[in-house]
């Protein structure tokens, strides 16, 4: 089997799917790319048994066939080869010889028979959405996903489908993000949980533009197709917690503050906080917001004050500054709105204006105030 392919085009596509491959895998075949050649088309597949990514390239080829090629050595070599046509020759024992303008490189491939088969999209429901809508949703929600494997339902993003739109929810029990798109229409009410890893892979490979994606799902898998790139992942088989019950219906106190100034003040003051809690206390009175942090063990203390617009009774409430800083990144407006209640009730964070066709709400649990 022989084919000719552009070195830079091949490298670009391989880098797009190489994130699927785990460094420490149990099965050696999972360290390989599967190359499939048919009618001047090359399909390259990578999998970790949970997620499959596939890309398609145009090549010059007279025959068809398959071979598994070790991913790391192929990527390392392509990174150092300038743009030029490369000729791949594969013999009957799956030995691969790569010929460039000035060199010849050999690597031992493997039989494709041992490469895992990808899941089929049987009984799948489908809908379309723009690439930017999915990328934005992933960016808004993924930071709140839990890393606690003992609670598998929280280790992914919950997709709640409706004819009126999609709601994306993520929580780690300390904070929660709910992001709704009303510019996407789904065929029926449904829901599923997508793991963090494939979402990060989609975020890295999809363009932030209005390209159309085809999204399909069945009871076990999610399928996303964009142009010549395909991703299939196993869904999390667990029940997502009833997130609606934890969102306060009425937080009477409202504070509007400049996002950039608030983030920077949190960064400065949190340097002096206890490193295990990152606790920063907010004292709000009139148009003054006071931030305070301390680490009693080391006699560290930091205080700052800034202006805000506040409608409510004087309040002192503490939060994890690291969480607040991360959550504020999700708001795309110059100002953010915090809706608060008592020092023991969850606070809500929203952008001062919602984008067209989208609604973002973030919830953060308070910490017990240090005396």
Residue ranges of model-derived segments:
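Structural preference for solvent-exposed beta-strand-turn elements
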Residues: 1-371
